[in-house]
């Protein structure tokens, strides 16, 4: 519980994109958004290496790969526009870079929702020492 409190305090100052991504995750999973995924497995959170631990972690791996294809803005800092329409996430930017970032986040949030049955608390706050296998290519 103390660890979740520390993570929550660290995220309180987060503006823009991470807040938006967390909102998408919350809507698609009914969880606490980023708090549920920030240090999950080998790929959720900052960085990533090794082999994804399960389908949920693979969502983060694919998300990292998606960010790697974005050109023209910083995916982790860019603020984009989106809405929820009939339960679907709709990205609304005309700017191609912002739209691409939104699409990466949209696909990841949907992936989390579709793979909630693989979410395993043993991978929360997962040590990167357990992620030493050779990383897959995007």
Swiss-Prot record:
Entry's PROSITE patterns? PA2_ASP (PS00119), PA2_HIS (PS00118)
Record-listed Ca(2+) binding positions? 43, 45, 47, 64
Compartments, record wording? Secreted
Q: How is the cofactor bound?
A: Binds 1 Ca(2+) ion.
Expression by tissue, per the entry, reads: Expressed by the venom gland.
Residues annotated as signal peptide: 1-16
Instruction: Say yes or no: keyword NAD present.
Output: no
**Cofactor(s) named in the record:** Ca(2+)
Broadest EC class assigned to this enzyme: hydrolase
Q: What is its EC number?
A: 3.1.1.4
Q: Which reaction does it catalyse?
A: a 1,2-diacyl-sn-glycero-3-phosphocholine + H2O = a 1-acyl-sn-glycero-3-phosphocholine + a fatty acid + H(+)
Q: What biological-process GO terms show up in the record?
A: arachidonate secretion; lipid catabolic process; phospholipid metabolic process
Which positions are catalytic residues?
A: 63, 105
Quaternary organization: Does not form a complex.
Task: Write out the similarity annotation.
Answer: Belongs to the phospholipase A2 family. Group II subfamily. D49 sub-subfamily.
State the protein's purpose.
Snake venom phospholipase A2 (PLA2) that is not toxic by itself, but the synergistical mixture of a basic and this acidic protein is lethal. PLA2 catalyzes the calcium-dependent hydrolysis of the 2-acyl groups in 3-sn-phosphoglycerides.
This chain's protein is named Acidic phospholipase A2 VP7
The scientific name of the source species is: Daboia palaestinae (Palestine viper)
